[in-house]
Amino acid sequence: NVAITDDLYRGIEDALSDTVNDRINQWKESTHDSRFESGCARIDIGTRWSLNDVIGRNMESKIYDKSIIVSAMNEEGQSFCEDVLTTDEYIEKKKRTAPEIWEAEYQQQPVDMKGRLFNELKFVSKDEFQEINKTNPIEGCIGYVDVSDQGTDYTSVAICAVIKKQLFIVDYLMTRDNTDITIPQTAAMLDKWKVSYCRVESNSMGAMFSRQLQTQTKTRILQVHNTQNKITRIIMSSAHVMNSMTFVRNGDNQSELFIQNVLSFSKEGKNKNDDAPDCLAGLSIFVQSMFKNLS
């Protein structure tokens, strides 16, 4: 048996639309993948429009045994196959094509690859983290909450665990649900990991969120008001995030949504949502103030 998908996206607009991309990913995971039989080979074919498209997510999760990337023109600027299109014909196409479209449609470089800030994150799987944790107990946990204040924003939560002077991001929340859902969810996360302290950004809805959260958890909730420009804060914290933090890939939708939001963040500022990177920036600042010996 072989399961094949081919060009799930009509074009760049589909791949860069959160709504369309989520719908395609949901169809792939539920309708398509539910038809797999034991031992079924799986082949996904398509243009690499976005880091967050179906193929991009699967590559990040290391689902594929092998990935074959065919660029229209090689590093020497020659056609990959003169019988398909000659080098001169590709050169003419490149002149008439927007650079980001050329890179994605012809060179298989996702349009959101250029300008990625968090391009060197460190990951471990859930199983790998559990193996580490077997012989090395968690010494303490802190958390950070970036509260949604607009309809398109996400409430983002990250939990950081300290093991032998190493920082592991062990749990995540990334949701547009209302506070009647997100506050109990956050409280449950904090209690699950026995988080000692959690900062909540108090801008806008954050103050109300933190007060209600404190009534539902044993964790000490600390409000923080950020005055620094968000993008500046994210960029300034990025080195610490990449150098000092290891991200546990739990395999659930929340963690993958959070991680993909971080990976797709562009330092050039073309971001539909930057809630997860903003959450990590806040967590990074908090970690460095709490654990000066780890910084």
Predicted regions and their residues:
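Gly/Thr-rich phosphate-binding beta-strand-loop-beta motif of the actin/hexokinase/Hsp70
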Residues: T135-V162, C279
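ATPase catalytic-site recognition across NTP-hydrolyzing enzymes
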Residues: G77-V145
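Acidic two-metal-ion nuclease catalytic site recognized across multiple nuclease folds
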Residues: Y172, L283-S295
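Conserved RecA-like P-loop NTPase helicase motor core
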Residues: D274-P277
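Short, glycine/acidic-enriched loop or turn micro-motifs at the edges of active sites
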Residues: Y9-R10, D149, M174, S204
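Mg2+-dependent endonuclease catalytic cores in nucleic-acid-processing enzymes, primarily RNase H-like
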Residues: W49-I63, I69-S71, G77-S79, D88-E92, ...
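Short catalytic-loop micro-motif centered on adjacent basic/acidic residues
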Residues: A41-I45, Y144, S196-E201
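Signature of the SF2 helicase/ATPase Hel1-core->accessory helical subdomain module
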Residues: V2-E76
